Amino acid sequence: MITADSRAAATALLEGALVIIPTETVYGLAGRADHPDAIGRIYAVKGRPSSHPVIVHVADPDLDASRPGAWVSDVPDYARALAQACWPGPLTLVLPRSDRASDAVTGGQDTVAIRVPAHPDALAVLRAMDELDPAGAPHGVAAPSANVFGHVSPTALDHARADLADRLAPGDLALDGGPCEVGVESTIVDCTGAQPRILRPGRIGAADIERVTGMAVLDASSSGIRVPGAMPSHYAPAASIALAPDPAALEAYVDAAIVGGTQADAIGIIAMEGVPTPEGATRLLAPASADDYARGLYDALRRADATGIAFIVAVAPV
């Protein structure tokens, strides 16, 4: 059932139901993070491997590891600085877990991924959970993307319902918060070492992190931490995709696809506004900015699948 009532959504979550909630990145399939049955249902509904960790979403950006109910056990100064600068927002921090963070949430690792979403509806739900059950505060929800595992992430409620409506139980809810503002998943940063390490790229980049922390940012190459959204099957449409490095290369990619047997009208183009669409191809997205590119990308990939596009050429935004 679709609802606009954040308190109804919070009540459902506290009772162990699942709720599709909007965030600024993508829609999430939320379940109470300290409720093992709810976490188990998230994995079952999505068809997600149980070894794959989920992100705990909370309303309070205070990363005090000493307070009762904390999800983390240790917070370095640079992680605290990132939280203060970037939360609420599309940044997930990986930190040493507390006893409250179960193996179901962490994928059996000794770390937990945590963030404060920036969407007002998501924050309203989380705050309502704390108000309705203050003894259990600070509450958190696990909220991986509200889609079948491996499919393109949903940036509108219709996307999520198309994937999950027939998999949810009668007591589960969906909260419509409109289109997602960012449109791609949060940046994930490992904060368990002496320096921050990006484990998954997103809206917040290395330069942003360096500016806040004053530290060089490491890449994920030497990290053994499993994180959400980092498997090869993630975010994949049915169509094949090629990434053209610049607009000048677009025609060559399209020509190669046609020579390989793909009909021109089954080729989809994602490129910045002003980049011409090759003759016969289908334009999927023509954004005016890099932010618009990110915001519209997943919707374009879903439309490609819905319209029978077999091959997509995406020109990198420059």
Each PLM stretch: what is its role?
Residues 1-318:
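Active-site-adjacent structural elements in enzyme catalytic cores
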